[in-house]
Amino acid sequence: FYGRPFPEVEPLLQQLAALPAPVFICMTPDTLLKKAFVQQAFSFQYDFHYPNRPARDIQPPTAEEPLLYNLLGDTERRESMVLTHEDLFVFLESVMEGKSISRVLKEQINAAYNFIFIGLPFGRWYMKILVHFLQKDANRKALKYAANHAFDEEIQAFMVDQFQIICVPARIAEFV
């Protein structure tokens, strides 16, 4: 599945790669965003979450050399991927314990003033837990936006009430 081409998302990924952001957290284990950076000859760092393994050292990311971070593993390291419910539980435990996510990445998330969530399945129970964890110590005045025209009213209300995420009723390509 992850090895096949997705020509419909390539223009969107090219646009995302051009954004001046220091961190891009991907919620898929594929390397499509990484390929978009390579195709445009942009400088970047790449890392991925590997449950229950010590975080690798990374340099503090900048807009000129951002960090691309695959939170659900990497397709080239199958054992890092979240493929089953058991993998999901191990992943969540690993994230909650905070041992396998780089200190530099945590500091970047906590210091960030802007977050853009694109295409995340906020209706899934584990996504709510994950967003809570990722933003629990983050700057409370940070602007947080989510683009997805398919959110139902209940999910939008939860996102606004619980996480102060502003839902933008636009298709992802229009939002970017």
Role assignments for model-derived ranges:
Residues 26, 68-71, 116-117:
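Short hydrophobic-aromatic micro-motifs
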Residues 42-110:
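Active-site gating loop/helix substructures
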Residues 29, 73, 120:
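Active-site metal-binding loops of divalent metal-dependent hydrolases
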Residues 1-60, 78, 114, 124:
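Active-site periphery "cap/insert" segments of enzyme catalytic domains
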Residues 19-22, 40-43, 56-65, 99-176:
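SIR2/sirtuin-family catalytic core signature
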Residues 11-14, 18, 90, 94, ...:
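Polar/charged alpha-helical tracts
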Residues 7-10, 84, 152:
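A diffuse structural propensity rather than consistent per-protein peaks
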